[in-house]
């Protein structure tokens, strides 16, 4: 059986089976070489503009999360840190109470436009009501987040 050659990593894999290829393609080094390759191609064609990257993640933010996690010694999610920082900025040091999250007024439903639920496939049961409610909550959260940033 012939060996598989990866153009990005410039190496041969020991076997040419789907499981070996799949594990290689999901590997950290392959992904890094893949990203580096297309970044270099973008720079060659002058379409690479680091200032137009849509992500707002900086090294300061990443280091702050790792420092906070080390100092806390807890395994709380990084998004919880954002919530605490945002609440301390707006509420002068108050901690976010997650039980209050569901008590929002539904008056803002008039301002929002919701897509209708997708049609169900014939022969399959309808999805539960929680699917629609969760989608509505996600859309509200996204709208709130975009309105507070602008």
UniProtKB/Swiss-Prot annotation:
Localization annotation: Nucleus
Domain of life according to the entry: Eukaryota
Zinc finger (Matrin-type): 4-36
Keywords for this protein: Metal-binding, Nucleus, Ribonucleoprotein, RNA-binding, Zinc, Zinc-finger
Compositional bias of kind Basic and acidic residues: 80-92
GO MF terms held by the record: mRNA binding; pre-mRNA 5'-splice site binding; U1 snRNA binding; zinc ion binding
One protein family per Pfam: zf-U1
Residue stretches in coiled coil: none
Region (Disordered): 66-127
Record function comment: Component of the spliceosomal U1 snRNP, which is essential for recognition of the pre-mRNA 5' splice-site and the subsequent assembly of the spliceosome. U1-C is directly involved in initial 5' splice-site recognition for both constitutive and regulated alternative splicing. The interaction with the 5' splice-site seems to precede base-pairing between the pre-mRNA and the U1 snRNA. Stimulates commitment or early (E) complex formation by stabilizing the base pairing of the 5' end of the U1 snRNA and the 5' splice-site region.
Quaternary context: U1 snRNP is composed of the 7 core Sm proteins B/B', D1, D2, D3, E, F and G that assemble in a heptameric protein ring on the Sm site of the small nuclear RNA to form the core snRNP, and at least 3 U1 snRNP-specific proteins U1-70K, U1-A and U1-C. U1-C interacts with U1 snRNA and the 5' splice-site region of the pre-mRNA.
Protein name as catalogued: U1 small nuclear ribonucleoprotein C
Originating organism: Candida albicans (strain WO-1)
The encoding gene: YHC1
